[in-house]
């Protein structure tokens, strides 16, 4: 008797991305034959273990087979089409994988906020009930008199206190982050939110960070799941977006 441990993937793109990273393959030049063989090996493993194979995995397998077939077909072209740029059968798949990579990185960054919250905000303590009964040897009249005195004392001390609700906006936090980064071009996200007064402020700061990443003003890296986020300033103008680049 032996046990086989099989990794579970959220969907076909999750599996494909795993195979690409495992084989250290360039997204822009995917060897379809190698990836298809490994992909089908995983599908067969599921079937051998009598596990249901989701329809989207089958659809992706068919797509990979089609791409491989198109790449193997003889390239007969008419003379008038000779000057046209030949379309790579992998092009659409590469676009989808690049998009998936973006969402995967954002999801990892979002998961990091949970770990940061746990670091800065304590959970509510467990309150264990302790029964300590005390006998009150007072009459109703005594209690009423004490209550009346408390009311009179409070009237004398009554002062209106206005508590101004702090408002945080993504725009203001973007400006704040840029101010930090101009002074210190490389820092940890925990350094930014260390003095945050509420969870809301931490969340708004994180959304501001995502916006700066989208604008290519900063690069962010997270070494471990739920870990701190390392931020690098790319300058006031940022840099041009390169889908194939991995920071």
Swiss-Prot record:
It is found in: Cytoplasm. Pfam families: SMC_ScpA. The keyword Cell division applies. The keyword Cytoplasm applies. One of its GO terms (biological process) is chromosome segregation. InterPro entries: ScpA, ScpA-like_C. GO terms for cellular component: cytoplasm. Keywords: Cell cycle, Cell division, Chromosome partition, Cytoplasm. Belongs to the ScpA family. PANTHER family: SEGREGATION AND CONDENSATION PROTEIN A. Participates in chromosomal partition during cell division. May act via the formation of a condensin-like complex containing Smc and ScpB that pull DNA away from mid-cell into both cell halves. Component of a cohesin-like complex composed of ScpA, ScpB and the Smc homodimer, in which ScpA and ScpB bind to the head domain of Smc. The presence of the three proteins is required for the association of the complex with DNA. This is Segregation and condensation protein A.
């Amino acid at each position: 008797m032996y046990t086989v441990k099989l990794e579970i993937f959220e969907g076909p793109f999750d599996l494909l991305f795993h195979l690409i990273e495992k084989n250290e393959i360039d997204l822009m030049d995917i060897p379809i034959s190698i990836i298809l063989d490994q992909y089908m090996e995983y599908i067969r493993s599921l079937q051998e273990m009598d596990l249901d194979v989701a329809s989207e995995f089958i659809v992706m397998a068919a797509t990979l087979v089609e791409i491989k077939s198109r790449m193997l077909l003889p390239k007969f072209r008419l003379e008038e089409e000779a000057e046209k740029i030949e379309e790579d059968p992998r092009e659409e798949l590469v676009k989808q994988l690049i998009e998936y990579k973006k969402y995967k990185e954002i999801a990892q960054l979002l998961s990091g906020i949970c770990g940061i919250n746990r670091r800065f905000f304590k959970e509510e303590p467990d309150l264990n009930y302790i029964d300590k009964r005390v006998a009150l040897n007072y009459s109703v009249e005594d209690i009423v008199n004490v209550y009346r005195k408390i009311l009179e004392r409070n009237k004398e001390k009554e002062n209106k206190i206005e508590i101004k609700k702090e408002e945080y906006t993504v725009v203001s936090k973007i400006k704040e982050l840029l101010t930090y980064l101009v002074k210190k071009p490389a820092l940890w996200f925990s350094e930014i939110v260390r003095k945050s007064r509420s969870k809301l402020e931490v969340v708004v700061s994180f959304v501001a960070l995502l916006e700066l990443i989208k604008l290519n003003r900063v690069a962010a890296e997270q070494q471990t799941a739920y870990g701190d986020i390392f931020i690098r300033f790319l300058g006031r103008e940022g840099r041009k977006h390169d889908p194939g680049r991995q920071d």
